Amino acid sequence: MTLPYYDAAAIERLLPPERAVAAVERALAGGLDPSAGVPRTSMKVPAGELLLMPAVSGTHAGVKVATVADRGRPRVNAVYVLFDGATLRPAALFDGAALTTLRTPAVSVAAVRPFLPARPLHVVIFGAGPQGLGHRRTLAAVAELSAVDIATRATGVPASIAAADVVVCATTAREPLFDSARLRDDVVVIAVGSHEPDAREVDTALCRSATVIVEDVATALRECGDVVLAGLTADDLVPIGSAPAGATRVLFKGSGMAWQDLVVAEAVLRADQGAHPGRAE
């Protein structure tokens, strides 16, 4: 059996960021329930962490096998295996790191798009790695950007954060990156850097002043240090797609879930089959 393999270049060619966002939005609008998924399995290994992330849909099953490396190495290395849902035979393999780099900002933007102001956006991004740059690319695909400032350990917190419409946190930080008192009242903040309950990128004041959107309430209370360390409860959290219209200060806290990889992998496969109608799964 020879399986199709989608490397980073193929994934980027077949599913540009705006189509990845649309795939996530369609899945959620179509009734996908993030709370129905199973938690990731995590194992500490000498150089970092090993993760297994399985998910199932009406047409496919899939699993991502990923490692999260300690500082100084590429953070995420992964492979994704997609299975046909009817036969359970392997259907395709994917570069799991590229899939992660695409799906994480797609989910973030799907979560906050209803709350983005209708003007060119000033964006501040903490983190110059794949996720920081992926969020920049995805935001630019769905909105006009007036300015983008990238903040790193070397640069510190830019003064422009006070004017930012959107702040993205995509780092390995374990403590808040900035004082939220410096932010606009109507800011949209995206925090996706950690899935550990003892690490956070934003402070308690932001968590308590914002509408806090999460992928799944139980997952956030188990894995998201921004939520846990702020002392938030289930009543303080809003599942993705359920935030009230008109919310002004918004925080999306994402830790990454297996359904997201499956949704985007299926979208890549559909795009390839659409481009090559005779190709069987």
What are these regions (language model features)?
Residues 1-101, 109, 119, 269-270:
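N-terminal ligand-binding/catalytic initiation module
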Residues 105-108, 116-143, 152:
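Glycine-rich adenosine-cofactor-binding loop
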Residues 144-145, 184-187, 209-210:
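A short helix->loop->beta-strand "cap" motif at the edges of active sites that frequently abuts
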Residues 144-177:
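Adenosine-nucleotide cofactor-binding segment
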Residues 160-162, 183, 207:
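A short, aliphatic-rich alpha-helical micro-motif
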Residues 166, 172-188, 204:
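Rossmann-fold NAD(P) dinucleotide-binding segment
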Residues 192-244, 262, 267:
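Rossmann-fold NAD(P)-binding glycine/threonine-rich loop
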Residues 247-281:
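C-terminal catalytic lobe of FAD-dependent flavoproteins
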